[in-house]
């Protein structure tokens, strides 16, 4: 279990300290009267933000300009990744979720129609049987399908898809780790094709990164979503060229409605089994590579290893459902049919499915809460892992006080969980302590302090949930980076409050990368 409680860092703190501290006279002598007058003037005070703030701050405090202001880039791509809504806006979240579902359904249908024969040949006729069950019309007198068998086939097919994707990616990882002279013909071709995609991404990102403003946290945009997804897909199972025709495991699952059938029959929601279209670690490698230079193989391997970790979590989750939950569901089916005296035991009764429903607040997503009072400033994320891992963590922010609280939480007990007993601290204990400690911080206004103490006695307001595409361990690492890296905090905590909240959520879901600072002499030449 880990716990971190910290003050957040913002730009401007060192400037204020330098102008009012006991060392001011020494600094004034060093930098001269002109710079001091500028910093203390109304115009200077207003302008000490972003790039100008970084310049003045570095002069006043003697810091390296490059260490003062860097360019911050969120490691997702607009159009290709999920665009991040304001976490405190359930309406924005709902619209984005619905649009995403419709897009995925459309792409899945295109893949199923175009590659159906190849897919069935490789993964078996069970896929087709599950799809026909999902779309078939009920007819009187036609023999009813054994729903438990359909459920087993859907889970087995999904397991085969994740296994195939994992295997192909593992092949690419091994090929990249070899010297080019040691690669087989197939491995060389695989690496060459992958590198061509990476170069396409790199070219697009370089065009965009030249326009990234030093004073703002940015997202990468520029290529259309289809082209980006096509470029980012390491090893498509079939097809290629345009994203809508790439048969990835994600697209095949959607096309044959595997998750929908599993959820409809058993109540088991597997919507959290996802992989990012573009791996954040791969974007980081591209951003770190010098312009016009080739990205090192080992840097690309890191991105692939993160995706393998993500796929491993998904595979283990499907295995957990198959090995631990399905036998229990079969027993529950028999019990429930006996109870109502129904001999048609091919059906999974709604009562049986409801036994395996997981409460909304314990599903493997980022659960979002706000304080009952001062909700715009005080909000929390409850990050929950896959069912088989059974871990969770708490991340709370008070933007008014510039305060953050992180804590690893208890293992949940529920129908799909792996925990045999509940251990550790609960969400209630974590948010109560968060409110209590925030209220004790120096500088808290009397009204804000009262509201924090009052909030401690009430449950936070539940505002919805966001899926995350990366592995839970990577999500935790992102949270700890936000908590412990003062440079990252300075870039996240800028702009309007809704922009700050959105940046924090994106940094948690996708990660954030700080690029190098801008040369001070170059800036002053054009200032």
Swiss-Prot record:
Q: Where is this region: Involved in membrane permeabilization?
A: 1-42
Location in or out of the cell: Virion
Gene Ontology biological process: symbiont entry into host cell via permeabilization of host membrane
GO CC terms: viral outer capsid
**Looking at the record's lineage, which domain of life comes first?**
Viruses
Q: What does this protein do?
A: VP5 protein is one of the two proteins (with VP2) which constitute the virus particle outer capsid. Acts as a membrane permeabilization protein that mediates release of viral particles from endosomal compartments into the cytoplasm. Permeabilization activity is probably negatively regulated by VP2 and is triggered by endosomal degradation of VP2 and exposure to low pH.
Protein name, UniProt field: Outer capsid protein VP5
Organism per entry:
Epizootic hemorrhagic disease virus 1 (EHDV-1)
User: Which taxonomic lineage does the organism of this UniProt entry have?
Assistant: Viruses, Riboviria, Orthornavirae, Duplornaviricota, Resentoviricetes
